[in-house]
Regions:
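Calmodulin-binding IQ motif alpha-helix
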Residues: 265-308
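Alpha-helical scaffold segments
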Residues: 1-270
Length: 308
């Protein structure tokens, strides 16, 4: 077994053990779509109240898994935006109840695909948050029904773009949404500190992937929102275990993609254990195969006696 497989197995077993503990109030609707929850974990725990809409959205669910389990109550809206679903799969399976709102959100759907299929019932609310939509595309297509909340959150929208276009959306009566700007992955803690006059939203700042646990601890005077912190992908299980007195939101923790990720220190600890086991195995093989060792001598004598 490779080190990667060893760590993956440890993580798998660790998740199983955590799920067995009733003291944690997991929300299985959210947990079902958590990328740490694999198909094997779902199959091994049929007693859990898994949510099939969440499972349908889970990035570990492939098209092969869906095809091999047609009896499951799949949600085709969520399957439609599952990142494992490509346009080729959709076109090759026209009999399936694909959902075009879901397809509009699918990260495999590019602007070229949208342009090549103008008569499809695209949903511009979801297209606006599609990671393939750039600012140039938005500027060149003013006539489209863009959703400015989702544009504000779109990872292709940088702080420089926002600053340079603060007036343009307002004139079009489509202002930037500062709630979603607060969550935008291009917004850093330095930007927030340097712009205290902006109508930041602390729920979404608390969730912003640039906000680390160290930043939160170093700025306890800020109005952090524990619902957002609970969904922040910098929060891992070690942080939660060491801070059980905090007002964690278990619904959002269940949805946190990093919640079951192993910390670097834990991976180092597991790696040391792995290589220690390897050394023990190698040493044992040396002991039983090298006549210089007593255990090998005894083995050879025993095998010789069995032959006569």
């Amino acid at each position: 077994m490779s080190l990667e497989s060893y760590i993956k197995k440890y993580k798998h077993d660790n998740i199983i053990e955590i799920l067995k503990l009733d003291k944690y109030k997991w929300n299985f609707s959210y947990l079902s779509r958590n990328p740490n929850i694999t198909w094997d974990i779902i199959k091994e725990n049929p007693d859990k109240p898994w949510n099939w809409s969440g499972i349908s959205d889970n990035p570990n669910i492939t098209w092969d898994i869906i095809k091999e389990n047609p009896d499951k109550p799949w949600n085709w809206c969520y399957i439609s935006w599952n990142r494992n679903i490509t346009l080729d799969i959709i076109q090759a399976n026209p009999d399936k109840p694909w959902n075009w709102s879901g397809i509009s959100k699918n990260p495999n759907i590019t602007w070229d695909i949208i342009q090549a299929n103008p008569y499809k019932p695209w949903n511009w609310y979801f297209i606006s948050k599609n990671p393939n939509i750039t600012w140039d595309i938005i500027k060149e297509n003013h006539d489209k029904h863009w959703d400015w909340s989702n544009i504000s959150y779109n990872p292709n929208i940088t702080w420089d773009i926002i600053k340079a276009n603060l007036s343009e959306p307002s004139e079009a009566h489509k202002p930037w949404d500062w709630y979603f700007i607060s969550l935008n992955p291009n917004i850093t803690w330095d930007i927030i500190k340097e712009n205290p006059d902006k109508p930041w939203n602390w729920l979404y700042i608390s969730e912003n992937p640039n906000i680390t646990w160290d930043i939160i601890q170093a700025n306890i005077d800020k109005p952090w929102d524990w619902r957002g912190i609970s969904r922040n992908r910098n929060i891992n299980w070690d942080i939660i275990k060491n801070n059980m007195d905090k007002s964690w939101c278990w619904d959002n923790l269940s949805d946190n993609p990093n919640i079951f990720e192993l910390s670097t220190n834990k991976k180092i600890e597991i790696a040391r254990e792995y290589f220690a086991q390897k050394r023990i195995v190698r040493h044992w093989r040396e002991c039983i195969s090298n006549p210089a060792y007593l255990v090998c001598q005894r083995r050879l004598i025993r095998e010789f006696q069995e032959l006569i």
